[in-house]
Amino acid sequence: MTLSIPPSIQCQTEAACRLITRVTGDTLRAIHLYGSAVAGGLKPNSDIDLLVTICQPLTEAQRATLMQELLALSSPPGASAEKRALEVTVVLYSQLVPWCFPPSREMQFGEWLREDICQGIYEPAQQDWDMVLLITQILETSIPLKGERAERLFTPAPAAQLLKALRYPLDLWQSTADVQGDEYHIVLTLARIWYTLSTGRFTSKDAAADWLLPQLPEDYAATLRAAQREYLGLEQQDWHILLPAVVRFVDFAKAHIPTQFT
């Protein structure tokens, strides 16, 4: 099946590609579109997810230019009828072929960083286990906007490293403060981790929620259902009130998510 860029995001995606190509120049190896745009369908608050693969580290000038100019092309979720939030991850090819564990990413742009970027604060290159999951998803479903198809560039991560990457976020969410402000995203991420470890496959956030809901006690199902409804743009939730329920859901999920692929 030949995938194509959804018409609703084509102009914004092409503008982002032109910017990335101009700034990275001869170091650019590939740009891939992945995520909801090509697998599961765009939802009201879905990002446009781009992976940029380069052959040389970014200079500080390149990093600053990308961060600042991506701000103008991106919009916070739900804030604009014309633009979506961009999530742009930049990685060195040498981190992925051959695999380094954990791999490092050169740069990541996302709307959650907008305030820092506006102040000229840019994250440096850093290790990121999520790169293993990202490449796994791209190998399953993606569109090459520049360069070769994913299966010609990348190789799958070994199962043991994929398992480590899937379970790594579970150690990050230890307290109420760790989940506050990102409640529905964390709840849906846990559903996706649960789905993948149980089935060996990746799926969209709302599909993972649909799969998990019938298996949960009602108290926990209600929290997941609330997160799913906000993600789908059906109902805005008051997460300040729901925070204790979210913490209980996180604790329950961490206790019941498989420790191995089943």
Swiss-Prot record:
The keyword ATP-binding applies. It catalyses: streptomycin + ATP = 3''-O-adenylylstreptomycin + diphosphate; spectinomycin + ATP = 9-O-adenylylspectinomycin + diphosphate. Residues 158-262 are annotated as: Helical domain. InterPro entries: AadA/Aad9, AadA_C, NT_sf, Polymerase_NTP_transf_dom. Streptomycin binds at W173, Q174, S175, T176, A177, D178, H185. Changing W112A: 8-fold reduced MIC for streptomycin, loss of spectinomycin resistance. ATP binds at S36, S46, D47, D130, K205, Y231. Pfam families: AadA_C, NTP_transf_2. Mg(2+) 2 binds at D47, D49, E87. Disruption phenotype: Loss of streptomycin and spectinomycin resistance. Mg(2+) 1 binds at D47, D49. The keyword Chaperone does not apply. Has an N-terminal adenylyltranferase and a C-terminal helical domain, with an ATP-binding cleft between them. Upon ATP binding the two domains reposition, antibiotics bind in this cleft. Mediates bacterial resistance to the antibiotics streptomycin and spectinomycin, does not confer resistance to kanamycin. Binds ATP first, then antibiotic. Monomer. This is Aminoglycoside (3'') (9) adenylyltransferase.
